[in-house]
């Protein structure tokens, strides 16, 4: 029998933490509702694991030899995992420095969503633990400057184990661990080792970190204005791309039907966008092409060198903003746009018009032909670069029992769902609606689709007045006729349909499987069908580009393929060669 062998050696310049061969006792690997074996893979031995469904976090724990790994010199741990099963899954990797690690303290975690047959690395960054020199004074940030101490940090000199697990799986999943390495040279962050004293304020008048210089950093107003002149000279030397039409389509390529709007067509076995002039169009762009962005300054005044928001000339860049996560959750606070203030100081009082014109030249100089989501309306409506737009279900009440990173899922059976979409789409009339330069519309963003059971279970865990729950129960009544018939299948003991309505406890997923999957499909299809109807009412010739999936299960993907002209994903990786659509259909895809 083959075993796992733990070593610390150089593997192509990387520190191999685990090598799967015959020299180590497999009892070092602890299984939680899972089974494993070492077997031969394509390029050597692998650890083959299958996780069950009886534990909240089934998986394996791999202990360090001699009780610990000293990874002080490294930046991250990388685990290479192959999905050897038939279903896509999201797998988590946790690195612990203490037996008491609890998912928040004394550990760091990352994850990857892996399709069947796909191999992907999970990189877990070793956020350092030491004395918190900031004294907890940094808050309300999406990321921290190598934050030392506190939750989600470890002591890299004392790494004791690596965990691989899947959260609440509804079916068994199988995967292979091909390697576990430490990599990336750790370079101590300047802010916490240079002992800048005092550290506060640490943001300069341009909104930049002040305790370090780098190539391209703006050092003065004169420097800012000099960069304007140098860019103007550079852009003047760049010629327009040859062989393209005004939209950026391939004018010298094959010709197709010109409809006056963007559309899709399969050409030689591959999906393409066809531009309004009938030319092949490969969309390559970026999101957030806008003039300003804001950061909260309330409760953080001491962070900033210059409190520009108090100056009369910069009042147009002061706003009130509402955050949806972290410290400022559900608070409306004063915000300031350093980006806007910089543009005003760089281009003068006509900065909006000057910058809007410049953006299109800048995009073309970078080889880009599309303005993506969340971009400035003034820039888009200049009609010089193709763009996408977005509509939102906005204030639709959520399914109360649902869960998600960005929030709960909207109740698509609530009457306000369609009403809110129509209100959002009405704002596009005379703007992007009917505009040939607008490729189409996304809806919402990175929604909480969960697994194939989540939204159905969320409906059942909601109060009795939840519209989705009412629809689900009506469907069950039509199928089973009596509560007794439902109880027999689900293994439940509801005394009446009203008893089911009042209950907020989820049934056994295995026994209620067919009904849960069926209603999940109903929710997903209602979402995409309704959005499509609303878009086509106002912009019948423009494309529905989907909802920008970040996490998605096959049922939601299949529903999107049924109603979207193009299915969109937000794929947070550099390479999509191994990406596969899991919606059982041949549809055009776009990274949103």
Language-model regions: role of each:
Residues 288-305, 381-404, 433-439, 443-504:
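Aromatic- and acidic-residue-enriched segments that line the glycan-binding/catalytic groove
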Residues 149-150, 165-195:
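Extracellular polysaccharide-targeting segments
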Residues 207-381, 398-434, 509, 514-517:
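Active-site-adjacent substrate/metal-binding segments within catalytic domains
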Residues 356-365, 370-379, 410-446, 468, ...:
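An active-site-proximal structural segment forming one wall of the substrate-binding cleft
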Residues 51-152, 158, 170-176:
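Extracellular ligand-binding interfaces
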Residues 13-33:
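Extracellular carbohydrate-recognition regions
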Residues 37-59:
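Short carbohydrate-recognition loop motifs
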Residues 518-592:
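Glycoside hydrolase catalytic-domain groove-lining segments
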């Amino acid at each position: 029998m083959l075993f796992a062998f733990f070593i610390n050696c150089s593997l192509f310049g990387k520190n191999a933490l685990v090598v799967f061969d015959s020299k180590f006792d497999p009892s070092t690997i602890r299984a939680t509702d899972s089974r494993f074996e070492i077997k031969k893979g394509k390029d050597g031995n692998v650890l083959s694991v299958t996780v069950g469904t009886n534990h909240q976090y089934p998986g394996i724990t791999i202990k360090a030899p001699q009780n610990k790994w000293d990874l002080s010199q490294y930046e991250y741990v990388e685990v290479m995992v192959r999905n050897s099963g038939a279903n896509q899954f999201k797998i988590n990797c946790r690195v612990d420095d203490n037996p008491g690690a609890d998912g928040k303290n004394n550990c760091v975690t990352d994850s990857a969503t892996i399709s069947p047959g796909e191999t992907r690395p999970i990189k877990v960054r070793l956020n350092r633990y030491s004395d918190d020199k900031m004294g907890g004074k940094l808050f309300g940030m999406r990321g921290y400057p190598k934050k030392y101490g506190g939750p989600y940090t470890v002591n890299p000199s004392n790494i004791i184990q690596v965990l691989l697990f899947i959260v609440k799986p509804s079916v068994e999943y199988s995967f292979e661990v091909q390697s576990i390495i430490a990599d990336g040279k750790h370079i101590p962050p300047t802010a916490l080792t240079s002992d800048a004293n005092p550290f506060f304020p640490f943001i300069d008048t341009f909104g930049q970190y002040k305790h370090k210089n780098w190539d391209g950093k703006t050092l003065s107003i004169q420097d800012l204005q000099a960069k304007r002149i140098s860019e103007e000279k550079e852009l003047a030397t760049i010629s327009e791309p040859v062989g393209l039409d005004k939209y950026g389509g391939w004018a010298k390529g094959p010709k197709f039907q010109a409809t006056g709007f963007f559309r899709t067509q399969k050409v030689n076995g591959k999906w393409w966008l066809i531009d309004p002039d009938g030319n092949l169009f490969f969309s390559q762009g970026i999101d957030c092409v806008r003039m300003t962005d804001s950061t909260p300054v309330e409760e953080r005044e001491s962070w900033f060198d210059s409190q520009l928001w108090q100056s009369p000339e910069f009042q147009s860049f002061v706003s009130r903003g509402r955050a949806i996560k972290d410290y400022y959750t559900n608070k409306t606070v004063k915000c300031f746009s350093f980006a806007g203030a910089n543009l005003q100081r760089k281009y003068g009082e006509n900065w909006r018009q000057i910058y809007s014109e410049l953006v299109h030249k800048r995009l073309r100089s970078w080889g880009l032909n599309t303005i993506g989501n969340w971009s400035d309306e003034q820039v888009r409506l200049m009609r010089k670069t193709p763009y996408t737009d977005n509509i939102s279900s906005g204030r639709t009440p959520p399914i109360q029992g649902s869960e998600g990173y960005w929030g709960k899922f909207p109740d698509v059976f609530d009457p306000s769902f369609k009403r809110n979409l129509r209100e959002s789409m009405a704002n596009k009339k005379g703007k992007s609606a009917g505009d040939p330069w607008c490729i189409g519309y996304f809806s919402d963003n990175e929604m909480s689709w969960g697994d194939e059971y989540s939204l159905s279970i969320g409906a059942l865990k909601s109060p009795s007045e939840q519209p989705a729950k009412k629809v689900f129960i009506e469907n069950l009544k039509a199928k089973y006729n009596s509560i007794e018939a439902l109880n027999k299948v689900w293994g439940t003991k509801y005394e009446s349909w009203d008893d089911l309505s009042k209950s907020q406890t989820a049934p056994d997923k295995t026994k209620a499987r067919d009904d849960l999957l069926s209603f999940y499909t109903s929710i997903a299809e209602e979402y995409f069908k309704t959005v499509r109807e609303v878009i086509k009412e106002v912009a019948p010739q423009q494309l529905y580009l989907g909802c920008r999936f970040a996490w998605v299960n096959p049922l939601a993907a299949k529903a999107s393929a049924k109603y979207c002209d193009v299915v969109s994903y937000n794929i947070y990786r550099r390479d999509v060669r191994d990406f596969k659509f899991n919606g059982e259909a041949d549809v055009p895809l776009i990274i949103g």
